[in-house]
Amino acid sequence: MNNYEAVFILTPVLSDEQVKETVNKFKDILIAEEAEIINEENWGLRKLSYPIQRKTTGFYFLLEFKSDSTIISKLETQFRRDEKVLRFLTFRQNKVFMEYALKRRNKLKETK
């Protein structure tokens, strides 16, 4: 099993309820495939670097999880099919990045 990180941007026209519902949909896909969700972060509404589908802002989310590589194609297919997702990026964390992510999570816990 490998560690993965998925960052995705949702369209800004969604209500808070729709945003939570969409994020839970992707988390449910991971859980159904027996992935272990390590961390999730809501980065909130942020300005995009360039317009995407005539939108200049979007809701950013990060999911860190541990799973087999077979789940990635299923998750990315769902990202592509969902019209609420503007962009997404999923990648495998290497050893150095895993250490960095752990330090970042610990720092976030300390600030809360």
UniProtKB/Swiss-Prot annotation:
Keyword RNA-binding set for record: yes
One Gene Ontology CC term in the entry: ribosome
SUPFAM superfamilies (UniProt xref): Ribosomal protein S6
GO MF terms, alphabetically ordered: small ribosomal subunit rRNA binding; structural constituent of ribosome
Tagged with keyword Ribonucleoprotein: yes
Domain of life, per lineage: Bacteria
Alphabetic keyword roster: Ribonucleoprotein, Ribosomal protein, RNA-binding, rRNA-binding
Job description of the protein: Binds together with bS18 to 16S ribosomal RNA.
Membership in a protein family: Belongs to the bacterial ribosomal protein bS6 family.
The name this protein goes by in its record: Small ribosomal subunit protein bS6
Organism the protein comes from: Azobacteroides pseudotrichonymphae genomovar. CFP2
Higher taxonomy: Bacteria, Pseudomonadati, Bacteroidota, Bacteroidia, Bacteroidales
